[in-house]
């Protein structure tokens, strides 16, 4: 009888919102933390890069931004995150590192702006570990909640430039991944059997992204002051996810229950707008991205309220000089600010955040750079029994072209 009670308790705990615990609990809900990564350059400027269109950079958030590449380019990156979680019970610090991106873009026709590209990036991330001391069914207990995994995206796409000032892009994305949650209860009273519930979800689905950039406002309006201005648009279709869930309930002595379920969920429609003013000595860019999570479907009803999300950012870059006389004049400097209204609310309280960013691009060879990006900010609040996360993020990437491998012979 006590084992049945304990099993019922842990199943209820696994589906309920967490009490204050001092852990990074927000990635526990729905599909986890949603990531918006276009490039390390955009990362350091606090934006996604919806309106970027320059040669020499791979920014995958808007496929149209690749249409001006003149050489085959590749990029790969890694992110380190150090965060402090604070709630009414105190604070804890966590650190983790993860893969950030890998992309390759190959120009097929520079005259027509045709570029073929592929990329692998994380779409969402689940990474939490929380311990709660609580009395359950009259017995003191230690409850452990943890989760890992997320959704990744494999993208293949192409671009086309029908006229000089208009670039178009189309991306096919295959979303895949696995998310594991673990809920464990250890009882102080030997009359209760310790229990552990392991849940694994395996997800897959597809979507399309259409992108466009336009730099012809100067000609359209007859003013040369707008010549450096580019506008960007990106639209991503909803994705239907096929989901297989495996649940495994263990007690102190035996594996009690194994359950496999199949169903569907979805990723939401996403749209973004951006603008970039590209001068010789200063680049200013801003963008806005909205995801309609309120219309998305979930395999199980989330234990939190789901809202449409919004991400807005504004950044500047001091690019490398075109006629450098020293190494440091070949270095680019970046900074920016971002605000994020997330797609979840808990107890009526939105989980929103902000960040200040910066970065440096160091030349490391012919047409190759090592990019460092930094973000410092916070999300959430300690109001209404919730947690506040203060974070420090560091991104490192290598961006290079085929010119990196050329051997230059000296006379």
Feature annotation, model-predicted:
Residues 22-44, 105-411:
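Outer-membrane beta-barrel porins/channels
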Residues 8-17:
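Bacterial N-terminal signal peptides
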Residues 1-7:
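Bacterial N-terminal signal peptides that target proteins for export
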Residues 16, 73, 185-187:
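Short alpha-helix boundary/capping motifs
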Residues 18-122:
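N-terminal, post-signal peptide beta-strand-biased segments of exported outer-membrane/organellar beta-barrel
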């Amino acid at each position: 009888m006590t084992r049945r009670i304990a099993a019922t308790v842990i199943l209820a705990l696994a589906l309920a919102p967490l009490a204050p615990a001092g852990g990074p609990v927000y990635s526990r809900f729905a599909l986890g933390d949603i990531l918006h990564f276009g490039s390390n350059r955009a990362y350091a400027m606090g934006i996604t890069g919806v309106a970027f269109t320059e040669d020499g950079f791979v920014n995958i958030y808007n496929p149209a931004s690749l249409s001006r590449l003149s050489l085959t380019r590749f990029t790969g990156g890694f992110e380190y995150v150090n965060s402090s979680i604070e709630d009414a019970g105190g604070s804890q610090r966590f650190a983790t590192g993860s893969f950030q991106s890998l992309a390759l873009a190959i120009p097929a026709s520079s005259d027509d702006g045709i570029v073929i590209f592929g990329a692998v990036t994380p779409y969402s991330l689940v990474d939490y570990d929380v311990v709660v001391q609580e009395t359950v069914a009259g017995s003191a207990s230690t409850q452990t909640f943890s989760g890992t995994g997320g959704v990744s995206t494999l993208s293949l796409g192409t671009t086309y430039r029908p006229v000089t000032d208009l670039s178009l892009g189309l991306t096919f994305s295959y979303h895949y991944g696995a998310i594991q949650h673990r809920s464990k209860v250890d009882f102080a009273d030997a009359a209760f059997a310790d229990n552990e519930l392991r849940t694994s979800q395996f997800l897959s689905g597809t979507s399309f992204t259409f992108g466009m950039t336009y730099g012809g406002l100067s000609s359209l309006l007859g003013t040369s002051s707008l010549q450096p201005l580019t506008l960007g648009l990106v639209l991503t279709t909803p994705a239907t996810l096929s989901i297989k869930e495996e649940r495994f309930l263990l007690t102190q002595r035996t594996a009690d229950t194994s359950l496999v379920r199949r169903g569907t969920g979805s990723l939401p429609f996403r749209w973004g707008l951006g603008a970039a003013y590209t001068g010789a000595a200063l680049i200013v860019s801003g963008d806005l991205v909205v995801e309609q999570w309120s219309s998305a479907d979930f395999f199980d009803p989330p234990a939190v309220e789901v809202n449409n999300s919004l991400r807005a950012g504004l950044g500047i870059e001091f690019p490398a000089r075109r006629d450098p006389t020293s190494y440091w004049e070949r270095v680019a400097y970046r900074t920016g600010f971002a605000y994020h209204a997330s797609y979840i609310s808990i107890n009526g309280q939105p989980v929103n955040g902000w960040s200040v960013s910066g970065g440096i691009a160091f030349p490391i060879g012919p047409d190759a750079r090592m990019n460092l990006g930094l973000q410092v900010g916070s999300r959430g609040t300690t109001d209404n029994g919730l947690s506040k996360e203060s974070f420090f993020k560091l991104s490192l990437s290598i961006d290079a072209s085929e010119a990196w491998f050329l051997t230059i012979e000296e006379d």
